[in-house]
Amino acid sequence: MFITNDIRYVGVNDHEIDLFEGQYVVPAGMAYNSYLILDRKTALFDSVDIRFRDEWLNNISSELNGRKVDYFIIQHMEPDHSSSIVEFMKANPDTVIVGNAKTFAMLDQFFEDVPANVRQTVKAGDTLELGTHVLNFVFAPMVHWPEVMMTYDSTDKVLFSADAFGKFGANDVEDPEGWACEAARYYIGIVGKYGTQVQNVLKKAAALDIKTICALHGPVLTGDLNTYLDLYNKWSSYEPDKNGVAIAYTSVYGHTKAAALSLAEQLKAKGVKIEVFDLARDDMAEAVEAAFRFDRLVLATTTYNADIFPFMRHFVEHLTERNFQKRRVAIIENGSWAPTAKKVILGLLEGCKDLTIAENCVTIKSALNAETRETLAKLAEEFAC
């Protein structure tokens, strides 16, 4: 596939995978992207998951038309992008591997048989001339691994962005919801903890004239790139994407669920955009993404072993691990003799910045009654705007 006259796509699609990184459900599969520049010298960007090594090598060969790969640029050492390196080098022993010092440290951790005499170490700001194409190396540490770097082709104005601007889903599957939905779930799940580091990279990118973004997952981005850059700026600064309420609940016998659904119906009747998640059954990553997407969050859970229900603890820890902040939060707790869920949740959220806790949090003892229904109605009023 042509990206520009000299840049070709040589990646693969994975429809065998069910869980990406062992935890994220990917019903539309995944893409492992790899790119090739054909100039006086040739440059290959990143490899693919080892299960698709042969397909990838065939893709490269068909584009080279008998030429060799001069440079193999390693932007990210995570195995879905690096596990085919050794097999490539066995077939191409004269290719120079380009990476930074941390790249090669990780290379030696993963593999024992990549020779040292074919390595070229680059530093931030270094350039590599291929002929008419000049590559500039932009370091992006902790987006989302420490060795990550991006590469800017100043000739075709293409940013090879590593995992940044990636999304879930194979590239041969039409996404009816567009780029942003699965890109948000991908960003928040995988990169979300590192907002400060993403902000630093966005500042570097602002100084570049970028016409195309080539990420390691998802489609090649062209056209009005401000759409994607603005969303990344919003996500990495932890600003809500939309006005609305995410309601996440756990329930043992249905009483806490009844309260959560009652609140949802009241908010819906007031014209509020809502999404409701049963944390024991629904996709946890979808619930986490919704908590970051909306400006309001309701946590409804039972007291369990003097703590909170395990799925709720898991959910809240997902939020805090990703620096959850700048939101309004309400709590609905339930406990038949000693409801302590609110206290536990507030303790878990203690380190989060700029959270506003609702005035009308609800404490249920066993089941809703007239008094708690009234408090629930007050919470609906409070969270309606």
What are these regions (language model features)?
Residues 40, 51-98:
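Active-site metal-binding motif and surrounding structural segment of the metallo-beta-lactamase
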Residues 36, 150-214, 222-249:
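Metal-dependent phosphodiesterase/nuclease catalytic metal-binding core
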Residues 45-47, 69-77, 97-100, 159-162, ...:
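Active-site neighborhood of phospho(di)ester-bond hydrolases with catalytic His/Asp-centered motifs
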Residues 248-270:
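Short, charged N-terminal beta->alpha structural module
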